[in-house]
């Protein structure tokens, strides 16, 4: 089929275009970290660390179809980017074999999408912290309480949205039940912020 061949050739095998898209998205992510409007470098660094660790752990469990990746659960829940899990359609095969089989031509797009947008989601989740029962972004917090040495020190002590949640059968739950109301109230803002930033990273 010439149409399919053309699509594969022009998209899946166009590595120059794929790498351009990757670096465009990476640039957008770094600009966000520099400006600090939605997250800063500390949030981005923590988000990157989590994504690498989760991907490594996912690789170790590649042969275990029952393993659930917290990173991919978050990306699926908030509908941010593509996940490696979404590429594993044939559950009777090794997960990495599924990725290669199902997305051999589009793999570089899917991997870059996962790698950058996963970081964006993590960074946003780290930027929101539970301040007296309400999740506030760093900017919201300092606008409300002022930027002093005390408020800076206090900010470091608050627990992030990322550290406050877990996924149980695809549902978002607070690790501490008393935080469930705050999590439910903040999840739409957190999710929409990450989704919009991820979309803008596509250029």
Locations of the language-model features?
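Hydrophobic, often aromatic-rich secondary-structure segments at membrane interfaces
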Residues: 1-203
């Amino acid at each position: 089929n010439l149409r399919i061949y053309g699509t594969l050739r022009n998209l899946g095998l166009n590595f120059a275009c794929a790498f351009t898209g990757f670096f465009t998205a990476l640039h957008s992510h770094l600009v966000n970290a520099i400006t600090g409007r939605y997250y800063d470098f500390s949030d981005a660094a923590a988000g990157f660390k989590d994504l690498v660790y989760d991907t490594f752990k996912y690789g170790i469990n590649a042969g275990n179809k029952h393993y659930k990746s917290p990173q991919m659960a978050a990306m699926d829940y908030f509908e941010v980017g593509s996940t490696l899990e979404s590429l594993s359609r044939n559950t009777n095969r090794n997960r990495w074999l599924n990725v290669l089989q199902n997305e051999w031509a589009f793999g570089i797009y899917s991997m870059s999408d996962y790698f950058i947008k996963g970081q964006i989601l993590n960074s946003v989740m780290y930027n929101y912290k539970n301040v007296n029962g309400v999740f506030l972004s760093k900017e919201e917090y300092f606008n409300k309480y002022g930027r002093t040495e005390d408020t800076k020190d206090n900010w470091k002590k608050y627990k992030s949205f990322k550290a406050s949640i877990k996924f149980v059968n695809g549902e978002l739950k607070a690790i501490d039940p008393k935080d469930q109301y705050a999590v439910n109230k903040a999840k739409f803002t957190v999710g929409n912020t990450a989704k919009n930033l991820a979309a803008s990273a596509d250029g």
